[in-house]
Amino acid sequence: MNTGAEAVETAIKLCRKWSYLKKGIPENQAKIIVCDNNFHGRTTTIVSFSSDPDAYSDYGPFTPGFIRIPYDDLPALEKALEDPNVAGFLVEPIQGEAGVYVPADGYLSRAAELCKARNVLFIADEVQTGIARTGRLLACDHESVKPDILILGKAISGGLYPVSAVLADDDIMLVIKPGQHGSTFGGNPVGAKVAMAALEVVKDEKLAERAENLGHVLRRELRAINSPMITLVRGRGLLNAIVIKPTNGREAWDVCLEMKENGLLAKPTHGDKIRFAPPLVITEEQLMECVEIIGKSIATFC
């Protein structure tokens, strides 16, 4: 496919078709569990299960067939899985748009186990977290989890060309027969070659290891900024965020505007959080320059 949203839509279709043909769920009764504060794209079906008014307002009527539960809440997942018509659990290993919310250790592995016990597909949306961003090739690798369906995009082509992908074993993937699904530019030779080259660079230049090491540096230096405006630093690898406490009438948006004036681009998400996802090829020197700008910009308001 081309975009992350298109890949998510494909995964939803694949999951539903599998549930009817393999699991035996009655026709048109399949449900997919999703999480509060999710972000999986902007198509009508995907915004149908969003909890963000900015994403779904005025776009109804919405697509049915989704159960939304709190993120990082295993008891809630276990309860939702009691429904015999649940076909899949669609989850971000780290919620990026929500403000880089990293779940508790063991959440993903236990969630995958619960899904397996109920014959429910564990679907990992790694469009934001995949391809070395979090310090592993996949964020699921931090807990040695192999998803039943894996969704990739963005970095799979190094940001050069629109490429996305859905991966699954044959038992799942082959429920869709030739002619039952397609994408105008999906699988085109240029896109495929670009993705292959990008993955070779990730491997050869050890970008996952770089992200892991530089992520520790970034979080350490951000925590060293002495400012009451920064109430929390969190992240994994080179996917990080700070939580901003409004101070003297200034908020996260004002901090971003000041950073722009000082030479660094970032944006707030969910109001009080600023996300930092620098290029995986960033040097430590450049990273320290970014931290200096962040500290200088925040100091303007305190």
Where are each of the predicted segments found?
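Conserved N-terminal phosphate-binding loop of PLP-dependent enzymes in the Aspartate aminotransferase
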Residues: 1-302
